[in-house]
Amino acid sequence: MDQKRLTHLRQLEAESIHIIREVAAEFANPVMLYSIGKDSSVMLHLARKAFYPGTLPFPLLHVDTGWKFREMYAFRDRTANAYGCELLVHKNPEGVAMGINPFVHGSAKHTDIMKTEGLKQALNKYGFDAAFGGARRDEEKSRAKERIYSFRDRFHRWDPKNQRPELWRNYNGQINKGESIRVFPLSNWTEQDIWQYIWLENIDIVPLYLAAERPVLERDGMLMMVDDDRIDLQPGEVIKKRMVRFRTLGCWPLTGAVESHAQTLPEIIEEMLVSTTSERQGRMIDRDQAGSMELKKRQGYF
């Protein structure tokens, strides 16, 4: 890796660590949202660096839909145990009682009830006043215009027309009781930055990011990996083994794989350099309707 690229990554690292420390010092009860993906892994690594050799001064929170890949659950538990992190797991009890699932109820309702409402329940339950998230501005257009300190009202709603100015490195964390701030320390990172930093720092990631032969079927222009026996096969669908990997991770029925032979980090980085598509091309929740991500965020999504 050339010196300019290394310096660039260290600048991003320093900015993120500064933000994480600012939140820990400014807020009474922060939490780090942990979705188990590559961005969460980088964010957790940065947080551990920020407070080394001490432990994290806040817990990790995983909002569980019950539909993550099995490898993600195993990785989550292994990571929390290895680093001695306090891990909180919340699953929307009303959604569980209703039997909400992406095959029967669709991606929009599943996401709203199991993710958005589940997150708001957890934030209210524990009284968190700040929540770290791993979103980046290069991922999606609504995230591109969101501040690093993203103000949320007492209903956890985001108003893109009422954002606070962020001049230089001055962040406004002033809130009233019941309000909160979502904090995005990776805002200025790109997907390429994330992968190069993972390689540079030797950060452990879910194996699903690396190409391997996996059982998939084609549905709605997406390669769906069949992760358990809850699959609802439609007429004419056939499960086949194909060489695939994932650029982004979520609920397995709503996350499409991409055909790839990149089995190492350098091969993933090389693949990213020539890619012309968004990493979120395989996320079904982004296809619900025009501007669906912004609408979800207005309602309290990550």
Curated annotation (Swiss-Prot):
Top-level division of the source organism's lineage: Bacteria
Listed GO biological process terms: hydrogen sulfide biosynthetic process; sulfate assimilation
Top-tier EC class: transferase
EC number, UniProt record: 2.7.7.4
Catalytic activity: sulfate + ATP + H(+) = adenosine 5'-phosphosulfate + diphosphate
A Pfam entry, by short name: PAPS_reduct
Pathway assigned in UniProt: Sulfur metabolism; hydrogen sulfide biosynthesis; sulfite from sulfate: step 1/3
InterPro entries: PAPS_reduct_dom (IPR002500), Rossmann-like_a/b/a_fold (IPR014729), SO4_adenylTrfase_ssu (IPR011784), Sulfate_adenylyltrnsfr_sub2 (IPR050128)
Family: Belongs to the PAPS reductase family. CysD subfamily.
Role summary: With CysN forms the ATP sulfurylase (ATPS) that catalyzes the adenylation of sulfate producing adenosine 5'-phosphosulfate (APS) and diphosphate, the first enzymatic step in sulfur assimilation pathway. APS synthesis involves the formation of a high-energy phosphoric-sulfuric acid anhydride bond driven by GTP hydrolysis by CysN coupled to ATP hydrolysis by CysD.
Subunit field text: Heterodimer composed of CysD, the smaller subunit, and CysN.
Name of the molecule in the record: Sulfate adenylyltransferase subunit 2
Gene source species: Salmonella typhimurium (strain LT2 / SGSC1412 / ATCC 700720)
Gene this chain is encoded by: cysD
